[in-house]
Amino acid sequence: MEDYIAALADFGKTMGLPELAPDEKGYCCLQFDKKNTVHLQYQPEEDQLIIFIQLDFVDSDHQLSVYQMLLEGNFFNADNNGATLSVQPGNDAVFLTQMIVKERLTFAFEKTLENFMNAVDYWSAKIDEANNLDEGKDVDEGEDEMEGVSENESFFKA
């Protein structure tokens, strides 16, 4: 947990939050752009950090197309920078989750978090678009913003 605490402290200094730290159970949440609340939970048994966010809910009228889109996005993590998309049973909440092993905490925490937030922006827009489609239309198959962006690259939008 020491690596996680140090990585979070370094990130906090960069963001102007010098006292940023997890609680005694390893939990911390961060809000970006006053709308995206990202949860971080250290798992001592696995010596890893899990990052997760609830993106949206699946509209019941568009379940099939949204589920298909999410499954395709998980295919070799092509559209999510190494994170995983899932749907919470019972309420159709869509989550994006990423595991960070201890070794990545010491040298790539900030970059991993940046890539995660890029995937959050991308998938939030895709889900919103899919939930608001007229029946019988497909989600826009236009240019894929994530195409060509590897897990080690970034394209923060200003």
Residue map of PLM features:
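Short, highly charged C-terminal tails/helix-capping segments
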Residues: D128-A158
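Hydrophobic residues embedded in beta-strands of well-ordered beta-sheets
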Residues: C28, D47-L49, D92-V94
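Conserved short hydrophobic interaction patches
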Residues: F11-T14, M69-N77, T112-K126
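A generic beta-sheet turn/junction motif
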Residues: D33, P44-E46, P89
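A short acidic-to-branched-hydrophobic micro-motif
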Residues: H39-Y42, E46-F57
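Short, internal acidic amphipathic alpha-helical interface segments
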Residues: Q54-G90
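Well-ordered alpha/beta subsegment
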Residues: A83-E114, D121-D140
